[in-house]
Swiss-Prot record:
GO terms for molecular function: 4-(cytidine 5'-diphospho)-2-C-methyl-D-erythritol kinase activity; ATP binding. Its EC number is 2.7.1.148. PANTHER family: 4-DIPHOSPHOCYTIDYL-2-C-METHYL-D-ERYTHRITOL KINASE, CHLOROPLASTIC. Signal peptide: none annotated. Keywords: ATP-binding, Isoprene biosynthesis, Kinase, Nucleotide-binding, Transferase. It is an enzyme of class 2 (transferase). It comes from the Bacteria. The active site is at residues 12, 122. This is 4-diphosphocytidyl-2-C-methyl-D-erythritol kinase. It comes from Paracoccus denitrificans (strain Pd 1222). It catalyses: 4-CDP-2-C-methyl-D-erythritol + ATP = 4-CDP-2-C-methyl-D-erythritol 2-phosphate + ADP + H(+). SUPFAM superfamilies: GHMP Kinase, C-terminal domain (SSF55060), Ribosomal protein S5 domain 2-like (SSF54211). ATP binds at residues 90-100. One of its GO terms (biological process) is isopentenyl diphosphate biosynthetic process, methylerythritol 4-phosphate pathway.
């Protein structure tokens, strides 16, 4: 193991999330276009007995307990390390925070467990941390060609949302998947046009549980987003804008009128090779 290592845990964004079925064990089948952003949490490891320290603006929402995903990841890898998690993303927010953190621990430890999905359905895709089409229960990953640059604005209403509760509120579990194969996306407008034909099937049940999500979506649309959608099981929403300057202007506008919300502009994470 490296003596000291710092590993980014980039935010995950579900540009689409189609729920296409449910297995007999209760796990849902998904078809999702997933990308990663150039903002997120940061994991640092150092030699020592297994421990976890929490820093960052959202650290108060977590506890360094044995069931924390960072500690579980280290145990799954069979490694000891002093782990520090800089928590920059809201907790339970639909952008992969905990799963991305666990994946970052595994990468930092140079560990390749046989079943990373044992830590959570989003851990395999977060281990990849590159644009993919994700299917199955999250374990079937098809890498995508480089996508056009996107100007993203994230908005969270300041509250977490339980993933199991959102799935439980889902009215239909056998929705249509995305087309096969996916089209080419020569530019951002082609990708955004395709996204308008797709869905997040968890958006409606999440809004029923937390109406504030609809307010986030309305704020993004009012600020000029070309597409506004919820990510994952919520409550974070995202808007896609024509330029980085427009995304930053929308960030200032939305943050200025909604001081309790978390608002952050981002682009896509650099491609991994």
């Amino acid at each position: 193991m490296p003596l000291h290592r710092r590993e980014a845990a980039p935010a995950k964004l579900n540009l689409t999330l189609h729920v296409t079925g449910r297995r007999v064990d209760g796990y849902h089948l998904l078809d999702s276009l997933v990308v990663f952003l150039d903002l997120g949490d940061v994991v640092t490891i150092a030699p020592g007995p297994l421990s976890l320290s929490l820093t960052g603006p959202f650290a108060p929402g977590l506890a360094a307990e044995p069931d924390n995903l960072c500690l579980r990841a280290a145990r799954l890898a069979g490694r000891e390390a002093r782990i520090t998690l800089e928590k920059n993303l809201p907790v339970a927010s639909g952008i992969g925070g905990g799963s991305a953190d666990a994946a970052a621990v595994l990468r930092a430890l140079d560990a390749s467990p046989r079943r990373p999905e044992a830590l959570g359905a989003d851990v395999p895709v977060c281990l990849a941390s590159r644009p993919v089409r994700m299917r199955g229960v999250g374990e079937i990953l098809a890498p995508l060609p480089a996508l056009p640059e996107l100007n993203v604005l994230l908005v969270n209403p300041g509250r977490g949302l339980s993933t199991p509760a959102v799935f439980k509120a889902l009215a239909r579990h056998d929705n249509p998947p995305m087309p096969e194969p996916l089209p080419d996306f020569p530019d951002a407008q082609a990708l955004i046009g395709f996204l308008h034909e797709c869905r997040n099937d968890l958006e409606a049940p999440a809004i029923a549980l937390m109406p504030g999500i609809a307010d986030c979506l309305a704020a993004l649309r009012s600020a000029g987003a070309q597409l506004a959608r919820m990510s994952g099981s919520g409550a974070t929403c995202f808007g896609l804008f024509a330029s980085a300057a427009e995304a930053q202007a929308a960030r200032a506008r939305i943050a200025g009128t909604n001081p309790g919300w978390w608002v952050a502009a981002s682009g896509l994470a650099p491609a991994k090779h």
